Amino acid sequence: MFIISQYREHRSLSILTQTCTIFRSMQVSSKHENLSVSFHLTPLQVLIITGTSSGIGLAAATMALEEGAKVLGVDISKPPDSLARHANYQFFQADLSHPEAPARVVEACSRTYGDRIDGLLNIAGVMDLNQSADSLSDNVWERCISINLTAPVKLMREVIPIMKLRGKGSIVNVASKAALSGAVSGVAYTASEHPWP
């Protein structure tokens, strides 16, 4: 597994696109049960990408489609028409804070593309309104943790058995550099965005 950190804060699509091109040439090895990991996109690879309606998720989906991949895009908001109309893009609307959403995402991918998942890009994320610990509501805490941390873990749990059957697959978990520095505000976001080992 490889973790991309530091990039969620960028808002420029050109910077995001440049960042996402890193995926094209990256080779990473995995220590988990001979599961090979490669970020070399080839035509017809099937990818699940969360957060495809804006930001890094949109840039990653656009790049993957340009490379010939088939993408199941997941977001709570509908994607831009330019993405939605692409022949190799299928949108699945889901609120990743709901406990059953990750399983439904993988079921939708299987219905659309069969029992093949070559990659999972966990990019969707939410902020916590920069609330400090003494003003943080339970709802904001739970939403940040469920979308930024729990949903990616559940999605990995769903796709790894499929990847093991094929003997290969790639997982990218996008984290934030905010998790590596302390601050008075942003407690839930910081806790939920720590890069995983």
Curated annotation (Swiss-Prot):
Pfam families: adh_short. The keyword NADP applies. Pathway: Secondary metabolite biosynthesis; terpenoid biosynthesis. Coiled coil: none annotated. The active site is at residue 189. Its EC number is 1.1.1.-. GO terms for molecular function: oxidoreductase activity. GO terms for biological process: terpenoid biosynthetic process. NADP(+) binds at residues 49, 95, 157, 189. Keywords: NADP, Oxidoreductase. It comes from the Eukaryota. Belongs to the short-chain dehydrogenases/reductases (SDR) family. PANTHER family: 3-OXOACYL-[ACYL-CARRIER-PROTEIN] REDUCTASE, SHORT-CHAIN DEHYDROGENASES/REDUCTASES FAMILY MEMBER. Short chain dehydrogenase; part of the gene cluster A that mediates the biosynthesis of austinol and dehydroaustinol, two fungal meroterpenoids. The first step of the pathway is the synthesis of 3,5-dimethylorsellinic acid by the polyketide synthase ausA. 3,5-dimethylorsellinic acid is then prenylated by the polyprenyl transferase ausN. Further epoxidation by the FAD-dependent monooxygenase ausM and cyclization by the probable terpene cyclase ausL lead to the formation of protoaustinoid A. In A.calidoustus, the austinoid gene cluster lies on a contiguous DNA region, while clusters from E.nidulans and P.brasilianum are split in their respective genomes. Genetic rearrangements provoked variability among the clusters and E.nidulans produces the least number of austionoid derivatives with the end products austinol and dehydroaustinol, while P.brasilianum can produce until acetoxydehydroaustin, and A.calidoustus produces the highest number of identified derivatives. This is Short chain dehydrogenase ausX. It comes from Emericella nidulans (strain FGSC A4 / ATCC 38163 / CBS 112.46 / NRRL 194 / M139). The gene is ausX.
